[in-house]
Amino acid sequence: MTAPRYAEIGVTSNFSFLEGGSHPQEFVQQASALGLAAIGIADRNTLAGVVRAYSELDNEELFYKPKLLIGARLCFADGTPDILAYPTDRAAYGRLCRLLSAGKLRAGKGECHLSFADLEAFTKTSTPSWPGLSRPSTSSSKAVQVSVDARVKPGHDEAKRAAGESRLLLVLMPPYRFQSHEITAALTRLTALQGAGVWLALVPYYRGDDKRRLARLQRIAAAARVPGIASNDVLYHHESRRALQDVLTCVRDKTTIDKAGRLLESNAERYLKPTEEMARLFRADPDAIAETLRFADRISFTLDELKYQYPDEPVPPGKTAQQHLKDLTEQGIAEYFPNGIDAKLRATIDKELTIIAHRQYAPYFLTVHDIVRYARSQNILCQGRGSAANSAVCYVLGITCVDPTEIDLLFERFVSEERDEPPDIDVDFEHSRREEVMQYIYRRYGRHRAAIVSTVIHYRPRSAIRDVGKALGLSEDVTAALADTVWGSWGKGLNEMQVRQAGLDPTNPMIVRAIDLATELIGFPRHLSQHVGGYVLTQDRLDEFVPIGNAAMEERTFIEWDKDDIDAVKMMKVDVLALGMLTCIRKGFDLIAQHKGKRYELADIKSEDDNEVYKMLQRGESVGVFQVESRAQMNMLPRLRPRCFYDLVIEVAIVRPGPIQGDMVHPYLRRRNGQEPVVYPSPAGHAGEANELKTILGKTLGVPLFQEQAMRIAIEAAHFTPDEANQLRRAMATFRNVGTIGKFEAKMTGNLVARGYDPVFAQNCFEQIKGFGSYGFPESHAASFAKLVYVSAWLKHAHPDAFCCALLNSQPMGFYAPAQIVGDARQNGVEIRGVDVAYSFSQNTLEERCGQHHAVRLGFRQIDGFRWADFDEANLWQARGDAPPEDWGARIVEAREKSPFTSLEQFARATALPKRALILLADADAFRSLKLDRRAALWAVRRLPDDVPLPLFEVAKAREQQDENAAPLPLMPLAEHVVADYQTVRLSLKGHPMQFLRALFAAEGVNTCRAVSETRRNGRRARCAGVVLVRQRPGSAKGVVFITLEDETGIANLVVWPAVMEKFRKEVMGARLLWVEGKIQASPEGVVHLVAEELVDRSAEMARLSDELIAPSASTEREAPLNDDRRDHPDLPAQQIRHPRNVRILPPSRDFH
């Protein structure tokens, strides 16, 4: 092809959020297709998108690889015109990062406040000291190196570096309307700053005055003795994106297309143009085109030059990091295996230490060990998971909890001699105390060497529809109707049926336009947020590697690159993750120690100790149990019937897209239950290799269930090379690469079939791999989670009182709301007592035994809107010097420790709580110990003076006035009490809303949930109604929706097939009280579903709960006295049904997708 003749230096990608109209990858692809010499990505005060452009150069489908220029568009807060800044080498790149970091760290999240003085401070020609900095390479494996200026002689770059040139190349970008003197002044300041290395951009705007305008700019440039340089100031890779870019402008400026006016581009010309078009536009000034080539040729920097160095860790005098790691390993062996280890485990540990030494990863392991050590010193539960669970060294260091004697380890999946990839250790900490660990990391390494990885928040269907609707000027009702038809977070847009269900015309041109633009917008980056816990640490300044900015959360900073970006540039991260179940387990252990005198740690709970725990799980009794409480897992438990720890490993992994999409679940269950023989696939005609898969698939009965098995089949049976297997692993491991995994299909299935394997087996194996590309568990990860499955199941079985209390104190977390957690505990014999000012604390607590278990007293934290403090965060308050947050509960406890409460007036005076707090307590029925039910308490509270503690003489006066004026109050109906309970504490101990509607539904032939769940006749028609607890639409279910209904008798599980879902989308997605008719589907193991055929939203029936004629059905099972919160107050009369009360909507369901 002919030599390139143009380089576009002014590209704004969609990482200039709500401005650029194309992805960085699209610009690279288009530049390649156009044959451009180079392309410069310069986003607004950010480098967030450059790694994606850099990675795209590895795309084998590019027929030509343009040179990539890494830069940023500096936008100033002091009126300085925009400036494109491109570093010539690694040192200049470091200064650009620090410049951007300075602007970001003085501003709020997502903002960058720069002044010209900042540019002066960081634009120095002297190269800063950079320990370990290698000389920039003159070539890049990421780009075809073509001399972009024929006049530049070979060795020019070397001469520049020898002369000490290291600078930011600065291009002043004048706005469309400009004052000549302002541009002249800006150029004067820039040339005074660094002499050469300054340009003036010449940009055509196609508004009829380009010739005159560009001539003015050329005269200014000549007078300032700086070259003019051509650019199209690009906003999108193709002109078809103009409409979408207009929408982004409207979203950014909070306006509509009709009102935006001159905020919008006047034409569609701001796209990436071919050389010929740019040459035509600048035919009167061809040197402006040639200058783009000279500009690009002066830049040698590429991201290949980023040489990441992990921080050194402190070690004892005279020891290396590797020696110290070995010492800690030996100490761990002595602690975990006091009787010594066998030869096999010794060989495993020695092998791991050898690989760690060769890869020089010892400091990384020491870092994670230190973080875990700190957490445990603060009594914070933690455990490692993921591929790190393949490491015996991690186990004896106390990082992971998977005993290497219980499971076969595959260390090569974690760290390999062949793979040039850093290890990645994920450690889960209690979600309520993880912030303490994160602040410890900041203190230890400093904010210039430690920061959190970012997460790119992308447009998803709902947000895209909402923003496009607003930009196009659609009414809020129309936009909401369209958005409400979308289920979940991901998707490709709306179909015609969904539009019709929203009550809209799918042929309406405005609706069509909105849907088309929203579909195009899906997947666009919206803004950056912080990763859930991935830290990057560096030996030198992190802010010379990548810009750092402030997070929205106080005391948090994060870098501009996400986990895939740092992987591309080979940075190592430490994942400090939050897990609610660890909080629950620790709080459960604390309650057991406090009330039962026994202290437990995670390691004390052995997974083979209690056969009754497995029996409980076999029955599917897993509400609240980690990882196995979803409907799919509850249905799998009776079918798989786990009997040992490894069965739990399989249970965790089997209900995942990988095994499901690969059609591996049913064959495994049939073999496990003896319904089909265990056979191992083997290649026909290869007698010597007949059992080559037995060692891989032996533990899973010849059926591949885990990611590691799929990889090993690819290597050993499909004969993938290690490099190909690594590419396959990477494609499986990241969500972003879903779709690219398909390129391995022909090779893997073809190789398996060619070697004599059954084509069906070959295809199923690959379908499983594609499932892992969406979401799948490796064996090591499943083993880590299986440990917590057992511990939480043990807590539930052995200490249901402590488990319930701890779950409530750890909310929000898990699959079920407090009402279901409490209901499950009551079914297991635990008494639950209501919130009461005489007995409750801020947290839920255990009280004296009532039968086999302690009673659970609900705490003030259960009252919505009531202020309470979580003392798990006390260390953070102290470290920051902050005052603890207001805790109304603590005031109550402090007051009653001084003197018992005798009346509402005395309570108000003693606690000095604001009126708002008193109303919340009354509405939560928390004054029963003062012989006041909800209505009487609300009436009495409202008669008190507002927010003024009552003096003693005023108390007597107020009481006399109340006695004189008060009329007898009718008792609140029980139905209204139940609804009020749900509104205030999100559960009721007095009854269930459905029991008051039972007569209504019974008249319609509606069965109770228990009756449906106990039916064993397949195909029998049934009707059911209940409150929607959970909606779930897992990706592996191919559009099937699972719904859990609850009534006063229990729960029923619904299956909604895609066709029914589309027909009744509104009811499925929005109903709080759902009526359903369908057919029973019962499995031999006793798992029952109602397959829905018709659904009706009956939420309006909730209004009947305020009807004075509604009473509980006589057939309803009476509430057991054990769980009646009137037990504390026997002198209160039973509730009678007298008077209506406004009924509010019940709390929403928990929806998962």
From Swiss-Prot:
It is found in: Cytoplasm. Its EC number is 2.7.7.7. It comes from the Bacteria. Pfam families: DNA_pol3_alpha, DNA_pol3_finger, HHH_6, PHP, tRNA_anti-codon. One of its GO terms (cellular component) is cytoplasm. The keyword Nucleotidyltransferase applies. Residues 1107-1153 are annotated as: Disordered. SMART domains: POLIIIAc. Its main location: cytoplasm. Keywords: Cytoplasm, DNA damage, DNA repair, DNA replication, DNA-directed DNA polymerase, Nucleotidyltransferase, Transferase. The keyword Lipid metabolism does not apply. InterPro entries: DNA_pol3_alpha_NTPase_dom, DNA_pol3_finger, DnaE2, DnaE2/DnaE/PolC, DNAPol_HHH, NA-bd_OB_tRNA, PHP_dom, Pol/His_phosphatase_N. It catalyses: DNA(n) + a 2'-deoxyribonucleoside 5'-triphosphate = DNA(n+1) + diphosphate. Residues 1116-1131 have a biased composition (Basic and acidic residues). GO terms for biological process: DNA repair; DNA replication. One of its GO terms (molecular function) is 3'-5' exonuclease activity. Belongs to the DNA polymerase type-C family. DnaE2 subfamily. DNA polymerase involved in damage-induced mutagenesis and translesion synthesis (TLS). It is not the major replicative DNA polymerase. This is Error-prone DNA polymerase. The gene is dnaE2.
